[in-house]
Amino acid sequence: MNTILVTGGAGFIGSNFIHYVMEQDPALKVINLDLLTYAGSLENLKELPDPERHHFVQGDICDGELVGRLLRKHKIDTIVNFAAESHVDRSIAGPLPFVQTNVMGTATLLNEARLYWLEEHRWSAKEIRFHHISTDEVFGALAPGDPAWTEETPYAPNSPYAASK
């Protein structure tokens, strides 16, 4: 059975992703790490297709010891990072939590994955995946008549939230 780590899985998008992947792959086990801040709710995880394949852990992606322990205990080969402080107005009023979670938390996930996957387990790049979920906010504003954004569009964030993603 494959096991993935989903961070921010109690939020709207993360929980819908969990519902989807569990429906699509009946052999998949999901470890769901979420701090349960203002954006997350365990109500979003009701009616999972097979609750026995879902394990919820309340915790912080900035906690490297916890992340490393989860990777090792569950032999995780894929991380899908939805965890984020994501409220634009809150980021303007107080940007530090956004930097902490969105920048340092992602760096912690990447570092723990590197330590486990590449140094300790020595898996090849074909065996591991890290999916970071961002936002179109990183590109700034799109005015009527502007060309659509592409992968080559330069970043032009308009808020601390967008800059932190």
Which role fits each region the language model picked out?
Residues 1-165:
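N-terminal Rossmann-like NAD(P)+-binding domain of SDR-like oxidoreductases, especially those catalyzing
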